Amino acid sequence: MATWNASSPAASPCSSRRRTKAPARRPSSESPPPRKMKSMAEIMAKSVPVVEQEEEEDEDSYSNVTCEKCGSGEGDDELLLCDKCDRGFHMKCLRPIVVRVPIGTWLCVDCSDQRPVRRLSQKKILHFFRIEKHTHQTDKLELSQEETRKRRRSCSLTVKKRRRKLLPLVPSEDPDQRLAQMGTLASALTALGIKYSDGLNYVPGMAPRSANQSKLEKGGMQVLCKEDLETLEQCQSMYRRGECPPLVVVFDPLEGYTVEADGPIKDLTFIAEYTGDVDYLKNREKDDCDSIMTLLLSEDPSKTLVICPDKFGNISRFINGINNHNPVAKKKQNCKCVRYSINGECRVLLVATRDISKGERLYYDYNGYEHEYPTHHFL
């Protein structure tokens, strides 16, 4: 009779023999010794709150910051800290005055890389404003007289109610004086890294031109009449010839860049159109540009448009605003911003509201439509 061998390859699969314990692991000099791991709860229970300590240290280090100009530490809500040197400055102590707390990074005058204002040559000034050649004086006089005759012939003989008409700008007669006036504007724009623009710009990625529809204006928008439209077109052609209103851009240590009359300007004279990039207001809510102008105020906030003269602009961005909280400062207003519907699109025009004498600075109300701009620090 044959006997059964358990080690034989022909062993029965029904055998009840099984391995109940793994063999002991052989020690190896290469493998590290076993480590006991702690749970995350045990680690967090014994950890030190480093972040909170840093925040407390930061608060303590900034609690004694004082203004570098006046030496006072009062008015924490108006004390700006330079993001580079950590020195403090009151907004009203800075020159020029800062009217609102910057949203992004802010650098003091010593740490900022400000471009020095430099004078430009005649060739560079003409190239900056894209003026090809000065028209001869007699040709200009004949052209203006011909335009006047055409406008007189187009007038109706019927008696109408007297209306305040928009007047065309009157440039200085001396061409050298006009060149010097344009030179001050070119130097100011160059110092801020802004390119000259005589119209609205529609940049890809911002608001398209199709979004600029005056019919979307909340409550409606006044339409520029035909006669005033002819005056506007006449002034725009004069701008392209280098015939600008008698204005110069000067730098004031308190107010920054300001616009000053270099000759007399009559009431209701067209000064300039507010120009720049057109964008949706929702895209500029965290923008530090202090010269944003409302173009279209829509019932739907997502369709409200603004003009942003941070990359392209003209002399209109340098005209300062009045202090709405000071009755005396309100008397300085001598021009206004008016929004018109022109060919179904919104446009913003700057117009004189009274006679302006030579040497007088130009001011208008920044809060003419919306009371959103802080002017309590204005002079």
UniProtKB/Swiss-Prot annotation:
Q: Which sequence ranges does the entry mark as zinc finger (PHD-type)?
A: 64-114
Q: What is its EC number?
A: 2.1.1.369
The UniProt entry, under InterPro entries, shows: ATXR5/ATXR6 (IPR053114), SET_dom (IPR001214), SET_dom_sf (IPR046341), Zinc_finger_PHD-type_CS (IPR019786), Znf_FYVE_PHD (IPR011011), Znf_PHD (IPR001965), Znf_PHD-finger (IPR019787), Znf_RING/FYVE/PHD (IPR013083)
Which parts of the sequence bind S-adenosyl-L-methionine? 255-257, 317-321, 366, 373
Region (Disordered) location: 1-42
| Domain SET: residue ranges | 245-367
Which keywords accompany this UniProt record?
A: Chloroplast, Chromatin regulator, Metal-binding, Methyltransferase, Nucleus, Plastid, S-adenosyl-L-methionine, Transferase, Transit peptide, Zinc, Zinc-finger
What is the first-listed, main subcellular location in coarse terms?
nucleus
Reactions catalysed, semicolon-separated, are: L-lysyl(27)-[histone H3] + S-adenosyl-L-methionine = N(6)-methyl-L-lysyl(27)-[histone H3] + S-adenosyl-L-homocysteine + H(+)
Deletion phenotype: No visible phenotype. Atxr5 and atxr6 double mutant is smaller than wild-type plants, shows partial decondensation of the chromocenter, decreased H3K27 monomethylation and increased DNA re-replication.
Q: Where does substrate bind?
A: 221, 339, 369-370
Q: In which tissues is it expressed?
A: Expressed in leaves, roots, stems, flowers, siliques and developing pollen. Up-regulated in tissues where cell division is active.
User: What functional role does this protein have?
Assistant: Histone methyltransferase that specifically monomethylates 'Lys-27' of histone H3 (H3K27me1). Has much higher activity on nucleosomes containing H3.1 than H3.3. Involved in the formation of constitutive heterochromatin and the silencing of heterochromatic elements. Influences which sets of rRNA gene variants are expressed or silenced.
Miscellaneous section: The binding to histone H3.2 is unaffected by mono-, di, or trimethylation at H3K9, but is strongly reduced by increasing levels of H3K4 methylation.
PANTHER family the record matches: SET DOMAIN-CONTAINING PROTEIN (PTHR48442:SF1)
Designated name of the protein: Histone-lysine N-methyltransferase ATXR5
Q: Which organism is it from?
A: Arabidopsis thaliana
**Protein encoded by which gene:** ATXR5
